[in-house]
Amino acid sequence: MRILIIEDNSLKAEDIKKCISQNIVDVSIDVEQAFNTGVRRAYKENYDFIIIDNSLPYYANDMNDICPDAAAIILENLEEETAGKCIICSAFEKGEKEDYFSRLVDGYSICVGYVRYNPCEDDWRNQIIRLIKGTN
């Protein structure tokens, strides 16, 4: 299985990568830190899953120029271009943005779900593994 993580926070990306590596066998994981490089890599290579942060810098060399709705734009761009599935994994407070993420899941067939990332909790780990394994 091949997975691409598009995440600008290196600690969060490593946390997600570690979680997947410990729970999924025969997995290859790549990480991109910016919207532009992530989308290009997703087009160029064949991934089973793409895990997307909602807010990403447009370019890796300018981490301050942020695209606040990166997940929606990536889903729109990849909807017809990839056979892979996408998961939104973003840090947000309970109740915040859940309607927005639900609409993305409902609106894009490649999006199988969203996960509220919180490094102090374990629930996100279980959710992301369930989504990857298809037992949500």
Residue map of PLM features:
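Conserved acidic carboxylate
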Residues: 7-8
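Helix N-cap/capping motif at the beta->alpha junctions
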Residues: 11, 31-40, 64-71
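C-terminal output helix
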Residues: 96-102, 115-132
